[in-house]
């Protein structure tokens, strides 16, 4: 039996203590069929519900999230180890997401009219149907709602298959939808095995698929969706570059790098993983970064002042530790941490690796935990070349006083997002997604609303 599942149950283990939170029986084929039936039936009514009514329900969902914020945040912390202050912030961010789409989402579905020869034409955005969402554990509520809210405002229904170790969070979220007054079937939660996921993807009632997860999971889900000729959106990993040029404000850059690397105990897809520092400031940046990292409090994630909690699973900690060991054997310098913390729980010491080169493990692979890799660049052009020398392309950050230069460099960076003098973040006002092995498709902004829509051309009076 693994830490997160057996043949019959999804198992939730507290990563700070090793104690079991609970276990959740995998659903039968009949239960899965019933969930898909509810989602398909609900779609027929939900797509016809006036937009103002959908908006009203999203506003109610924001209220339901806030009403149980403490219970949901505590569940997140107990299931995957997120420090409680960050878990509370996740719930509030989700509430604001609901409110933002309640206000702005309907306009994103307005028809686009145009004059054409011999008549008039317009493009209408029609929902596709029930969307299957396979979601990860690192942001148990935000990752779900980031995709679900724009998908729902568009008129689709949503079937969530969550990670096995955060099923408690999934059920609390489902309860919030019920309290907000959403009709049955609009937001479904299924607890199934990988075989159950395959069954759902192949089922004709599922119109499309979205996944946030690993490259391996993305390839598997993408292949199955392709075999069924169904659209899919994949938000996969990232090994994001964080570029600091010689003229940058180092104090600001260091602060952003620390937050960008160590929030959520380093378990973030869009995070400052490869710190690419121009050689004129690499020594000073490194000194300040190590000192700032040393000040971070590691400990019980239920304590409000803890910044770094445990990693979500012991197997992930073992994998990270091996990546660090491999990088050190390849010639990197260990400046801080570099080992599993002693005692109970899946803790890993905040780690800083210096003298990392493009041939080393921590440069080539994604390190999903509290480990920063410092790489030296000769100049801005070399920094961009290093940034692009990756299988991933999620986000990138540039710190420099020369904003005009940064704007120029953005066109050279092979990523879905670029942040100038600020660390990467997801926000409903702008789209989110990657290129290369970071996936394809987009979430958030109007792109997220229309991602699972049929852009239908309506042509009138064509002669």
Specify the residue positions occupied by each region the protein language model found.
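ALDH superfamily catalytic-core signature
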Residues: 216-357, 420
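N-terminal Rossmann-like NAD(P)+-binding subdomain of aldehyde/semialdehyde dehydrogenases
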Residues: 1-120
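Rossmann-like NAD(P) dinucleotide-binding subdomain of oxidoreductase/dehydrogenase enzymes
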Residues: 110, 114-252, 377
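Short loop/turn microsegments at loop-to-beta-strand junctions
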Residues: 7-10, 272, 394
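Residue-level signal for inorganic ion chemistry
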Residues: 18, 54, 76, 98, ...
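Conserved C-terminal structural/oligomerization subdomain of aldehyde/semialdehyde dehydrogenase
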Residues: 14-23, 206, 243, 297, ...
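A short hydrophobic/small-residue beta-strand
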Residues: 157-159, 334, 417
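Short, well-ordered beta-strand elements within core beta-sheets of diverse protein domains
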Residues: 20-27, 42-48, 133, 242-244, ...
């Amino acid at each position: 039996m693994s830490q997160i599942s057996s043949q019959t149950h999804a198992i939730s283990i507290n990563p700070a203590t090793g104690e079991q939170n609970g276990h959740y029986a995998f659903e039968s084929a009949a239960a899965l069929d019933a969930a898909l039936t509810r989602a398909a039936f609900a779609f027929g009514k939900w797509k016809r519900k006036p937009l103002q009514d959908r908006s009203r329900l999203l506003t109610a969902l924001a209220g339901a999230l806030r009403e149980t914020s403490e219970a949901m945040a505590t569940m997140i912390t107990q299931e995957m180890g997120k420090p409680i202050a960050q878990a509370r912030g996740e719930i509030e961010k989700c509430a604001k997401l609901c409110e933002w789409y309640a206000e702005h989402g309907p306009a994103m579905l307005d028809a686009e009219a145009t004059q054409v020869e011999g008549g008039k034409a317009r493009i209408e955005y029609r929902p596709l149907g029930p969307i299957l969402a396979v979601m990860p554990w690192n942001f148990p509520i935000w990752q779900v709602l980031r995709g679900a809210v724009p998908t729902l405002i568009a008129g689709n229904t949503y079937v969530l298959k969550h990670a096995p170790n955060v099923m408690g969070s999934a059920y609390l979220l489902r309860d919030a939808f019920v309290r907000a007054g959403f009709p049955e079937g609009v937001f479904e939660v299924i607890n199934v095995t990988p075989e159950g996921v395959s069954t759902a993807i192949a089922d004709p009632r599922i119109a499309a698929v979205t996944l946030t997860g690993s490259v391996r999971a993305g390839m598997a889900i993408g292949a199955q969706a392709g075999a069924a000729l169904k659209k899919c959106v994949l938000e996969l990993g990232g090994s994001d570059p964080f570029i600091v040029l010689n003229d940058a404000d180092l104090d600001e850059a260091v602060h952003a790098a620390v937050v960008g690397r160590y929030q959520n105990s380093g378990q973030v897809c869009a995070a400052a993983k490869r710190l690419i520092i121009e050689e004129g400031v690499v020594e000073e940046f490194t000194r300040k970064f190590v000192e700032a990292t040393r000040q971070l409090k590691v400990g019980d994630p239920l304590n409000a002042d803890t910044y770094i909690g445990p990693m979500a699973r012991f197997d992930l900690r073992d994998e990270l530790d091996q990546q660090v060991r491999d990088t050190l054997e390849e010639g990197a310098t260990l400046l801080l941490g570099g080992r599993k913390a002693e005692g109970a729980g899946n803790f890993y010491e905040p780690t800083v690796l210096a003298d990392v080169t493009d041939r080393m493990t921590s440069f080539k692979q994604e390190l999903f935990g509290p480990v920063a890799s410092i790489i030296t660049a000769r100049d801005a052009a070399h920094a961009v070349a290093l940034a692009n020398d990756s299988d991933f392309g999620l986000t990138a950050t540039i710190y420099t006083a020369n904003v005009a230069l940064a704007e120029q460099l953005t066109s050279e960076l092979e990523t879905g997002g670029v942040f100038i003098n600020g660390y990467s973040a997801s926000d409903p006002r702008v789209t989110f997604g990657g290129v290369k092995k970071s996936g394809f498709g987009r979430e958030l902004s109007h792109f997220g609303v229309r991602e699972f829509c049929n852009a239908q051309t309506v042509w009138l009076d064509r002669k």
